[in-house]
Regions:
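PLP-dependent amino-acid enzyme catalytic core
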Residues: 1-117
């Protein structure tokens, strides 16, 4: 079964205390080119500069409610950063598995959020 509007609303409510609202910006040039209103959600203003924090928080909050105290994931960057940041916020253990060679910038941000790689 896929996502439902009720499930999406529940997830939004669950993560609300942990995320900031991001701006919705009209893409004027793209709108003119396509002859339609095009709007872009700017997720680069989040703590991890990606929407990935939203999914990580939603999943980890649900896991915490079931007693999970440590999680692991495999990621080349943005998802790992989201999980690391969520782990820091929720005070649960996180292990991030990244392929070699590791992107130095993404690894540094992940380590900054206290997640071992």
């Amino acid at each position: 079964m896929g996502p439902t509007i009720d499930g999406i609303r529940a997830a939004a409510e669950r993560i609300r205390p942990y995320v900031t609202e991001t701006p919705l910006l009209r893409a004027d040039v793209l709108s003119a080119k396509l002859g339609a209103d095009v709007w872009l959600k700017n997720e680069t203003v989040t703590a991890v500069a990606s929407f990935k924090i939203r999914g990580a928080l939603n999943t980890m909050l649900a896991a915490c409610s079931e007693g999970v105290s440590e999680v692991g994931t495999s990621s080349t960057g943005n998802h790992g950063q989201g999980v690391a940041y969520a782990g820091m916020l929720l005070k649960i253990g996180v292990n991030i598995f990244m392929p070699k060679p590791v992107n130095a910038t993404k690894a540094a941000k992940t380590l900054h959020d206290h997640a071992p790689i």
